[in-house]
Amino acid sequence: MVENIPPVLSSHHYKHLKHLDRCKQLVETCVELLSKGDHDALAYLARTLGIPPQLRHKVWPLLLKYHPMCISPNILSNTVVWDSEHNFYKLVSGTSSSNDINKEPREGLENLILHDLKKYFRNVSKSEEDHELQVLKEAVLKFLSKWSRIFQYESGLAWIAVGLAEWIPIIENSEGPIVLNERKNHTSGTTTPNQPNPTCLSPLFKEYPLPSYLKSKLPKDSIFDFNEIYERIVLVILHCPDTITAQKLVEAESLKNSAPRRGSYAIKEGKLNYSPFLSGGDLGYQTQVFFKVFSTVLPELYQPFTEENAVQPSSKRTGWLYWWMKCSGARAFQKQDRGRLWDILLGWRPEPNRHTIDFFLNYNSKKFDHLYHSRFRNNLDFFNSTSKNDPFWFPDLDTIPLGTSKFKYDFNVFEELLDRNSYGHDAPPDPVPGNNDDDKIPFSLIDSHIQLVFIYIAILQHNEFKLLEFEETETSEFLNNVPMLSRADDICFKRLCDDDQSTYQNGFTSQEDLPKRPGSSKLRIGSDAKTSRSFNDILTMAGDIWRKWLWQELEECFVSE
C-alpha cells in the first residue's frame, strides 16, 4: 500500500529539493570562480547568497586579500577618545600612555587571553586543547603586537579567533581542513553534566562534504596563514571611518545656508547634518541607529530595552549588544549564522572608483580601484539567474555617483533621493538600446556595519511574538545565544552529497542539528518551524526594513522649499 504524503509535507519537500539544487549550483560556481581567482564575483556571492560552508576556508582569504578595509585600514580605538571641547584625542581613563602600552607583562596578557579562550573549550579534555589554545593565543598576540596602541585586548578578540577557527583550519591533514567543532553538551535531563568531549577538532568535509571532483579543483596553495587571516578579519570587524573629520566637514558644509540647493528639498534645521546612514559611523553611531530603528520598527518589543552600557561585555543583561555590534556576532550567534554575517562583511565592495571608495573610506589616501572589475567575467548563466539588486538597494541610489563633488556627503545624497522619488518628478529616461548591463556587478550601496544593524532588527522582528512572551531571563538567554536562523541552508550543505532525499524528513526534526552554547539554560528556544528558514529570508527582510525606514527618515528630516 502506497502511503499518501500530506500536501503540506509534499510542498515542504519540493521546496527543500529546489533549495538543495540551488545550493549545489552555488558550490559548483564558487569552486569554478576560485579556480579562476575571480574575487569580484565571489565577493558578490558572499554579500548576497553567502559562501558555502565547505569553501569559506578558501574564499575568505581571497576576499580579505582584496578587501578595501584591509588594503586601507582604520579601526575604532579603545585606548583614546576624542575630546570635542579641547579638540584633541585623550587616553581612555585607566589606559596606559601610548609609550607604555606594549610594556605590559606578556605573561599577564597571555593568561587573560587563555582565560577567555578556555570558556570555549570548557567541555573538552585538557590534553586535547593545548595546541589549539596556543595557536589561537598566538594569533591574538600577533594582532596586538601591531595594533595595541589603538586597540588593547578585549575578550571579543578571543571569541573572534574562536569563531574564525570554526571555518579556517588550524591544521590540515589527509582528510582536508581541520576546524574547531566543539560538541556542546545538550541540556536535556538525560545528559551527564560536565562530561568532557575527547576533542574539539573535526574535518570540515566530514560535517560539510564536498564531492571529490570539486575538491580536486580547489587551489592547493594558501594565500595567508591563520594569523594573517585573523588580523585581516579583525580589521574588517573593527573598521571605523574617520568620524571626527567627517563631522567637521559636514557641519562646515551645512553652514553654507546661502548656497543654492540643487533639488526641491532642504534639510530641516538640526536634522541630518551628520547622519551617515550610507557611509557608516563609529560604534556609538551604529548603536544609536540600532536603537532608533528598533524603537521605530518594533515599539512594543523595544520598551524593556535600554541603551545604557549597551556595548560592555560585563553585563549579562545588556552585554549581548557588545557581541552583536562590536564583535559582529562572535559568541552570541551560532557558527552557521555568524558565518553568513561575516560573509556579508567580507564580501562588501563599493563601486570600484576612487570617489565611491573614498565616500566610504573617508580617510583613504591610497589608489586601488584598479584591483576590481565592474562586470562579471565568468559563469554568466548562473549570475543571470540571480537577483541583480544589492539586498540593501534603494530607488535610484545605484545611479548616484557617490563621493563626487555634488554628492560628497550623505545628506547631499538624501536630498537627491527625495527629489527623484517625490511626486511630480520626471521619470528617468529609458535605457539606451543596445546598452547591455546584464553582466554588470551590483555593488554595495551602504556601509557593511550599517547593513548588520538592519539584519539584527530583522532577526528581532522575525522573533517578535516569541520575545514578547518571554520573561526577562528567557529574553537574555535568547539574545546571548541566538538560535540558528539558517537551518534550511545548513541541512542542504550538510547533505550535499546525499542521494536519498528521504533523509530530509528527519532533518527538520532532529534535535542534533540544534547546537547549544555551553552553560545555557534548559529553555527550549528556537525549536519551532521558523528555524527551518533560510538566512536569505532574514537578509530580504532586512533590506525591506532598510528601505521603509530610510524613506520615513527622509520625509521627516527634509522639508519642501
Curated annotation (Swiss-Prot):
Question: Where is the protein situated, by its record's location annotation?
Answer: Cytoplasm
**Keywords of this entry:** Cytoplasm
For region Disordered, the annotated ranges are: 507-526
Q: Name one GO cellular component term.
A: cytoplasm
InterPro entries this protein is in? Rab-GAP-TBC_dom, Rab-GAP_TBC_sf
- Does this UniProt record's set of keywords contain Thylakoid? no
Source species, domain of life: Eukaryota
**Annotated Rab-GAP TBC domain residues:** 50-349
Question: Which SMART domains does this chain map to?
Answer: TBC
Q: State the family named in the UniProt similarity comment for this chain.
A: Belongs to the OCA5 family.
> What is this protein called in UniProt?
Oxidant-induced cell-cycle arrest protein 5
List the source organism.
Zygosaccharomyces rouxii (strain ATCC 2623 / CBS 732 / NBRC 1130 / NCYC 568 / NRRL Y-229)
Protein's gene: OCA5
